[in-house]
Amino acid sequence: MPVSARGAPDAEHWAWSEQTDKGRVVVLSGPSAVGKSTVVRCLRERVSNLHFSVSATTREPRPDEMDGVDYHFVSPARFQQLIDQGALLEWAEIHGGMHRSGTLAEPVRVAAAAGFPVLIEVDLAGARAVKKAMPEAIAVFLAPPSWEDLEARLVGRGTETPEAIRRRLETARIELAAQDDFDEVVVNRRLESACAELVSLLVGAVSGSA
C-alpha cells in the first residue's frame, strides 16, 4: 500500500462545529521516518471526534493488536470479495504478496457524511488511489525539513541494516519528487506546528468550503 503553510487554529482549544455538513477527508502520506505516526498520534489526541481510517488486512494479528482497532483482520477470501465489490478505496500486496492491506470505503464515507473529520494514512500509491476514488479528499504530503534531516532520522532509528536504509532512502527520493502532486505540503520541522497545520486542514471541513 500500505499534501501547507497556512494559518492554524489553536489545536488545544479547538471544538468541532455541530453545524458542519460534511467532514473533510485528509489523506496523509510521506517518506519513512518523516514522523507520520507521531503526527497521527498528535492529531488523534487533539481532535476528539477524528475518524482515523483502520485498514483491512489479511495478515495474522500480532499479540498486542486488536481487531477493529489496529486493523480489520480478514481472510484472503474476504479481502478478495472486498476488491470485487469495489469496497476498498485503495489496496496493495505487501512484502511480495505475503498479505494484502487496504482502506475500507464505507467507514470513511459514512464518517464524512456525518460531519466528522477523517484521516487516512497511506503510502504514495495509496494516496493517489484514494484521491482518484474521492477527488474531494485533501492529499497531504508530510515532508522533512531537509534531505539530511530525513537521512539522520532513518539512521538514528538504529533498527535497520545499512542495506534496508539504502532502499528506504531510494524510495524516499521518489516520494519527495512527487510532493508537488499533492494538494498540500506540510513540513515537519516541529511536531507542534505540523500537527497544528493538519488540524487546520481537518477542521476546515465544511461542505463546499475552501
Curated annotation (Swiss-Prot):
Annotated localization: Cytoplasm
Gene Ontology cellular-component terms listed: cytosol
Catalyzed reactions: GMP + ATP = GDP + ADP
Enzyme class: transferase
The keyword ATP-binding appears for this protein: yes
Function, in words: Essential for recycling GMP and indirectly, cGMP.
Protein name: Guanylate kinase
Organism: Mycobacterium leprae (strain TN)
Gene: gmk
